[in-house]
Each structure stands twice: as structure tokens, then as C-alpha cells.
Amino acid sequence: MTHRRQNFMGGAAILAGAVAVTKLLGALYKIPLGNLLDREGMAHFYAAYNIYSLLLVLSTAGLPVALSRMVSRAAAQRRCGAVRRCLHLGLALLAALGLVCSAVMCLLPEALAAALHDPNAAPALRTLGPAVLLVCLSAALRGYSQGLGDMVPTAAGQVAESAGKLLIGLGLCLYLLRQGAGTDLCAAGAIGGVTAGAGLGLLVTALLLPRRAALPEVRDVPPASSRVLRELLRTGIPITVGAAGMSLITLLDQALVTATLRDTLGYTTAETTALYGEYTFGMTLFMLPPSFIYPLSVSLMPAVSAALTRRDRTAAGIAAGAALKLTVLAALPAGVGLSVLAGPILHLLYPAVPETAEAAAYHLTFLGLACVFVCLMVATNGVLQSYGHPLLPVISLLCGGVLKIVTNYLMVGDPATGIRGAAVSTLYCYALIAVINLAAIARLVPERPGYISLFAKPVLLTAVMALAARSGYGLFCRLLPERWAVLPAVLLAAVVYVVLALAIGAVTRQDLQTLPKGEKLADRLHLR
């Protein structure tokens, strides 16, 4: 075969870099939108985007991974016919799923918008519909490419998709605003960038793939189509169910919160939309740390699986412990930092809508803490799946979902708390999921590090960092305009955290060695 195969660490580094770039572009896309659309427009935007995210996860989370594994196995055996059969059937299956999901969004936008109690979100839903099919096709090609060991088409396609979303989405939104369009059409224009970006990402992936993944003539007898489809579904469905957790909870949250505000507290549809819009400003930042930490956790999971394949449970426990430790070290300062500086950060990012930023600060205070548990959920899900327990994350997700329903009803339905209860219930939900997963790992992975040693130093470091952040912000407010004082405060907190982490040995060479390029990073930090 003439495809280009990268080593695991190099491939993981390429994907991690692409994810970092795409999430940065995503922030540059959504944060300006908040200033342009304010709370009503962002509520319409997220109503469509939350449905899209769930349908996208259901379509693309598991099957491309299953396709990648099957292609990798067949390629290692130099069975070109099997590789082609996997690609063709995987592409057909994903195209069918994408077509169904796109049809639902394009043909039933009014019904979907009504289910979320936001009828003005219908134009955005219709505009976003074709994106599901486009991303499904991209996911099939990317799964095939990754199975051949080449991460470049995936990385390039993701970056192109995010860049197209940023440029076209913001451009359409600005144009419609200048034309005097309503917030519903402006939100539809903004979200049209997602559809355009998906098309651009598919184009880039499709153009790169033939040159980098060419196969010789078929010389083997490919497996039966029914067998390939069964294996795709058997492998992909458990992964899909586990990956759908955050999207499902977010969509459930929106439906429950808006219904409770309208039906229990008696708000009008317009008032409900505005209140939920405030909440989405906090949600935008809440989703950032998990997005950056996800590739870190994912890049460590193959090391766990490889060790278990060798029946080396000690090495598997070390790799699982490193995944959890690095997740905690990254998630705690990110989440707590968002929490203690919620107001200053929001006022920095949303100067055009100061009242909305002020209202959203309360939500971000709790959502920042919740994102710590989201990151733990992602890491622990990966560990449990690597150890052959894919159903346990589903059980913990169901428990968290039940708690979310109960606490939403009790807190959002209380006139004393109202919409403010939504962020608190989100914190409770993800905390329960993370605790259940950690308890399962404690029972099933005896080789893992003790939880006291895992959490003690990061918690202490984060407490000192939070104190430095708040104190630094107060000090810099005397020297700089209040809006800009948060930047040096964040820098001070980051320096304090990193210096103390190295000083007290919170990070070791063994921890970093499991990461892509971790050996070089450990050398630069002079870790032993």
C-alpha cells in the first residue's frame, strides 16, 4: 500500500494541534456573535446548534471510529479489498444517517423549534440542516484516512471547516444586521456559516485523500457486506451512546429550562428566550476547557488499550493514572479560573452587551466548576471503555440525566432562583457522573493511583492560583481600565500555577512521557 503511515505520537500531535486551532477559531466565531446578536439572537442560535450537535454525535461519533479500526486492521494485513469494502460501506451508512438527520432538520424545523419553546429558531434549524449530511461524509473519509495512519486529511479538513464557519458565518450575520433583518434571520445567517464550513471541510478532505491514501489493485477477497456492517454497528453504537452524553444533556437542559420558565413561572415566550439567551453566554465559555482537554485524554487511551492487549495491567494502570492526573491538572485551573473571574472575563469578551454579560456571570461561576467534572467525565469514560466496560458510562450518564431533570424542576421552577438554578443543576449533574465513574474505576482498576494522591496537589495548587487571580485582578484594576485588568490577572494566575506545580513535583517525567512529544517537553522542563 502506498498510504502514508505516521507513528501514533506524531498522529496524535497532529490531531491535538488541529483541535486546538479549531477550538480557537470556534471561540473567535461564537464570542463576536454574542456581541452582535445579544441574548435573544444567541438563544435562537443555540436552539438550532444544540439539536444539530446531538444529531451530529449520533451520526458520526461511533461509526467513523469503528471504520478507522477496521481499516487499520485490514491495512496491517495488506488486504486492500477489505479496506475498500470497509470504506464503501462505511461511507454509504454514514451518508444514509446524515441524509435522514438532515431531512429531519430541513423538513421539520418548526416542530423542532416548538419542542424547545423557541419558534423563532426555525430559520436557523432549516439553514443548518444540510450540515449534518456534509459532516457525515467528511467523517467517513476521515475515519478511513485515520485507519490508514494518516491524520493530515482529518486535521486539514477540521481547520478548513472552522475557518469557513468563522468567515462566512460572521460575514452573513453582519450583512443581515446591516440590512435590518430580525434576530431570527441574523441567527440563521450566522449559523449558515456552519453549513458552509462543513462543505469546505468536506472539499478539503476529499481533495487530500486520493493523493495520500492510494491503494493498489484489489488482490484479496473482501469480507461479506453483511459482516462488515454488523462489525461497524457493533463497535460504533456503544461509542456513540457514550459520546452523546454532553450533547444529550445540553439539549435536555434547554428543553426543561425553557418549559419550566414558561409553564411553571409564567414567563412569555420572548422573556423565556431572553433568559435562556443569558445562560448561553456562560455555556459558550463552559464548553471551551473540555474541548481542549478531550484530545489530551483521547491521546492517552491507546496506551491503556495497548497495555491491556499485552496483558500488562500494571502499565495499563500507569497510563490510566496519567490520563486522569493530567486531566485534573489541566481541568481544575481552567474551570476554577472561569469561576472566580467569571464577571471580568465576560465583560472583557462582550463589551457591546454589558447587561447580558453581568447577568451571565452568575451562570459562569457555577458552569466553570461544572466544566471540571465534564473533563473528568471525558477522561473516566475513556478509561472505562479501554478496560472493556462501555456500558458503565451510559449508566452514569442516565443517573446524571435523572438528577438534572429533578434539580431543574426544583430549582428553575422556584421563583426565588428561576433561570439561575440551571447552572447549579448542571454542576450537580456532571459532578454525579464523574463521581460514579471514579467509583467504578476504583473498583475495576486496582493498579490506578490513589485518589488522594491524584487530587491533593492539584486542589492545593488551584486554591493558591484562584487567590492569586482574584488578588491580582483587584491590584491591576488600580493600574489599568477595569475591563483590561483581567488579562494580566489571568497571566499571573497561570504563572503561579505552573511554577508551583513544577516546584512541588505535581507533574513528573513519567506523566509527560505518555503524551505526544512528552519526552521533549519533560527535557525542557528539566523533569526527572
What are these regions (language model features)?
Residues 152, 163-203, 207, 391, ...:
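Membrane-interface helix-loop junctions in multi-pass transport and translocation proteins
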Residues 34-54, 183-188, 230-235, 258-287, ...:
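Interfacial/gating helices of multi-pass transporter permease domains
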Residues 61-76, 282, 290-312:
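Helix-loop junctions and terminal segments of transmembrane helices
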Residues 471-528:
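Membrane-proximal transmembrane or re-entrant/amphipathic helices at the cytosolic face
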Residues 7-65, 102, 131-132, 238-259:
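Signature of the first transmembrane helix
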Residues 13-18, 126, 130, 145-173, ...:
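Alpha-helical transmembrane segments of multi-pass membrane transporters/permeases
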Residues 1-25, 81, 85, 223-246, ...:
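N-terminal membrane topogenesis motif
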Residues 109-128, 273, 339-371:
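Interfacial segments at transmembrane-helix termini and the short loops linking adjacent helices
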